[in-house]
Amino acid sequence: MSKKVLIVTGDAVEALEIYYPYYRLLEEDFDVTIAAPKKKKLHTVVHDFADWDTFVEKPGYLIDAHASFAEIDPTQYDALIIPGGRAPEYIRLDENLPKIVRHFFEANKPVAAICHASLVLETLPDIMKGRSMTAYIACKPGVEAIGANYVSEPTHVDNNFVSAHAWPDLPAFMREFIKLLNK
């Protein structure tokens, strides 16, 4: 039986950070569910690193959320991915999401978080305290505020937890995550 992976996100998810993991997991024959605050078509955004001091944002593609957070029973899944973009800014406020994420850490299941996904993890300081991770550099203060150790690496693995800076790091991020899934 194929392993089941849950991706949690919402509108304004970074396009590459959802599409690359989604299709990479399907390619490996995993069963993948995308969940969001509401079951709907999600609007993605493209974050690019132009000649600015920060990233720029453009509209991206649409992608279906297969389920709402309220419909998710995390015990039915083997692993979790949290993409970045701006979605983490508001999905972390959904009362169901911290419970979902907590389950994966407490059950020691593989968890992957990229870029601004660390904003979701800020809702679980008791889980993150003492863990090491990386994230988009602008998220470093939030990572440190919850007691996690920010690591200046493009991709980092801390036991069952894989984290990465941003979409340019997706190949290593997914390689490490799939290694955890195949253990």
What are these regions (language model features)?
Residues 1-107, 119-132, 140-183:
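Extended, subdomain-level signal for the structured scaffold at the beginning of enzyme domains
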